[in-house]
């Protein structure tokens, strides 16, 4: 089973409940199994997010902008894997929809947010 990311750490979910994504074109279950987080995981994630938001509020705008640009670059570096998985989970065509529209829109929004942070 996949782990949950809470407070920067991948860990086992508190609950043993899980689900699998299904390819809507074939109705076949995809191989990965994902946890259904319970309230303990949700509370821990929310507490970590609150703490991170407070820390992030004190960062200079350029640091936030640099992070957003690096995030966009990371998505682009892994674009083939992201598009492939999104295709399996949604049955949307890899091209043009996912690779040529959705992924560039996502990275474009991240870069626009980075530019806005730099501009103040």
Please state what every model-predicted region is:
Residues 1-120:
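N-terminal Rossmann-like NAD(P)+-binding subdomain of aldehyde/semialdehyde dehydrogenases
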